[in-house]
Amino acid sequence: MTDRLILTVAVLGGTGNLGPGLALRWSRAGYKVLIGSRKAEKGQRVAAELNQILDVNAITGLANQEAAREADISVLTVNHTAHRSALKSLKPALKGKILVDTTARIDFRDPKPPEPPSAARIAQDLLGPEVAVAAAFQTIPASVLRKNLDDPLDLDVFVFSDKAQAAEEAIRLAEGGGMRAFNAGGLENAIVAEGLVAMLLSMNKRYRSKTGTLRVAGITK
């Protein structure tokens, strides 16, 4: 891993709900963004759609493994049901790099907190010590990311990692995308963020919203 400024971000499984919005914000902020998908063609199609929104040609679609190999840092945004299989297939390409895992193992139809360990702890154990895993972005509604791309978002990102550099880079990514971010401890703590997703889904359903999220009070950055 490197201390240099990270310039290339791979959004792995980036054709779903969360990935495209993150890709738009990071591309707008000046990062080179790679959209990864199980099939390169799908990644290329979504990348073309995002480039059209931004009126640029800065986002590239690739197969997940190729995107992970080319990137300085990768962000995993696959559906939680594909979490383990995606990690196993990506392990060789992620060696020596940082992976930010956005996974929250929540059934949207019946949201309940998952059992520990956290998804990010599972990822770290599967990938081994040669990959530095951080967890972030679990509590961010996908729908808010595409709005007002040049404006900061009124929400906070909670970042978890056992590796200081991985946490720092995840925070930098969040801030690059217009989000305030906090180091919230190690990977074991990430189970709390997954549980908060269940809470937010329940609240959004009750109050007929799609954009409910979290903001920290009483801590100044």
Named regions from a protein language model:
Residues 5-8, 96, 154:
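Phosphate-coordination loops involved in phosphoryl transfer and adenosine-cofactor binding
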Residues 53-54, 58, 63-98, 102-108:
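Rossmann-like NAD(P)-binding element
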Residues 103-143, 147-149:
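Rossmann-fold NAD(P)-binding glycine/threonine-rich loop
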